[in-house]
Design a protein with these regions (language model features):
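Short C-terminal tail/terminal secondary-structure segment
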Residues: 107, 190-191, 196, 202-215
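Substrate-binding pocket helix/loop in short-chain dehydrogenase/reductase
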Residues: 29, 57-58, 62-70, 171
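Alpha-helical segment proximal to the catalytic Tyr-Lys
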Residues: 86, 132-136, 199
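Active-site loop-to-helix junction immediately N-terminal to the catalytic Tyr of the SDR YXXXK motif
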Residues: 61, 108-117, 129, 157
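Active-site loop of short-chain dehydrogenase/reductase
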Residues: 14-15, 42-43, 88-103, 136-139, ...
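A glycine/serine/threonine-rich, flexible loop-to-helix segment
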Residues: 136, 148-175, 185
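Active-site helix of classical SDR
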Residues: 81, 119, 127
């Protein structure tokens, strides 16, 4: 999958430095940023788009599973933000940090989402706190909070079988736009937050959710 993403980017004329690593320690995150600096000379934009979900009722979830979700969604976002911040501060020209939250950071869910909801609420907290902390430096920190988007993890919701149809209908009843999200729907918010157009925005959570959280 990483090779395919790299190939797609190169086909669009972009230079690519692909690293197949998990940002699980401070040292690894520093190495990721250093690789970007080595290849491109500097780092101006960080997008932390990885994440994990583990759905289970609280009485059936082992603490290790809860902590694993928190590590993937919270700790690794924090570590990457820290590594990028150090580089951006050294460069002295500001920068853009974009984290990936979720509508579940704002809203609960009855189907066993305690780990995921808690982790995305924490991402929102990191975003707001860093927005305040780094505001004077010219580094903006914002997050995008999607709802259900087409991805390998949600592909089943886009199917035509009875389970998907029933689940989708119940969910879409709360989405004013009347459809699920497509990857293209994230392009605009990402471009905005990565560009000079968002220079006066920091500490914000941008809900790319078709109006789901408005009701």
């Amino acid at each position: 999958e990483l090779d395919q993403i790299s190939a797609n980017c190169k086909a669009l004329g972009a230079e690519v430095e692909a690293l197949n690593v998990r940002p699980s320690t401070e040292a690894i995150c520093d190495e990721i940023i250093a690789a970007g600096v080595k290849r491109f000379g500097r780092v101006d934009i960080l997008v932390v788009a990885s994440g994990k979900n583990d759905v289970s009722k609280i009485d059936q979830m082992a603490p290790e599973r809860f902590l694993d979700v928190m590590d993937a969604n919270v700790t690794q976002s924090w570590l990457m933000a820290k590594a990028a911040t150090k580089q951006m501060l050294a460069q002295g020209q500001g920068g853009k940090i974009i984290l990936m939250s979720s509508a579940r950071g704002l809203l609960g869910h009855p189907a066993g989402y305690t780990a995921y909801c808690a982790s995305k609420s924490a991402v929102d907290g990191i975003t707001k706190a860093l927005g305040c902390e780094l505001g004077p430096t010219g580094i903006t920190v914002n997050a995008i909070a999607p709802t259900v988007f087409r991805s390998p993890l949600t592909a089943w919701m886009f199917a035509d079988d009875e389970k998907a149809t029933t689940t989708r209908a119940g969910f879409l009843a709360r989405v004013p736009k009347g459809r699920l999200g497509e990857p293209e729907d994230l392009a605009g918010p990402l471009l905005f937050l990565a560009s000079r157009a968002s220079d006066f925005y920091t500490g914000h959570i941008l809900y790319a959710d078709g109006g789901y959280t408005s009701g």
